[in-house]
Amino acid sequence: ALRKVDRNRFVLDNVTPQPREAKRYKEEEEFPGHGRRRRRRSKGKGKAKGKGKGKGKRRRRRKGKGKGKGKKKGKGRRRRCRRGRGCKKRKGKKGKGRRRRRGKKGK
């Protein structure tokens, strides 16, 4: 439960403080036939550094037909396949889009 300590400071009193993980990087190890040696273990690298994103990975919103045509970007870096949205072999296959009801006149 939270216990109020200060005007705006609370403390968990039902949580026992966990013992900190011992320093990992110097520990003795027995090597059979070689006696004991102290070996440095790395403290771990933390998070892996992400792979850098190339220009093509940055997502751009696909500019729709309506609502003002923004500046279309250049072709950029061409990938192997230039399958567009309307391609049958595509993973996210083409949607129907917004079907416009034109009424009777403009059939």
Curated annotation (Swiss-Prot):
Annotated region described as Disordered, given as residue ranges: 1-107
DNA-binding recorded as keyword: yes
GO CC annotation, single: nucleus
Species the sequence originates in: Bolinus brandaris
Regions of compositional bias (Basic residues) in chain numbering: 34-107
Prosequence residues removed at maturation: 1-35
Positions of transmembrane segments: none
Gene Ontology biological process terms in this record: cell differentiation; chromosome condensation; spermatogenesis
Ranges of compositional bias, category Basic and acidic residues: 1-10, 20-33
Name recorded for this polypeptide: Sperm protamine P1
Annotated tissue distribution: Gonads.
Function statement: Protamines substitute for histones in the chromatin of sperm during the haploid phase of spermatogenesis. They compact sperm DNA into a highly condensed, stable and inactive complex.
Localization per Swiss-Prot or TrEMBL: Nucleus; Chromosome
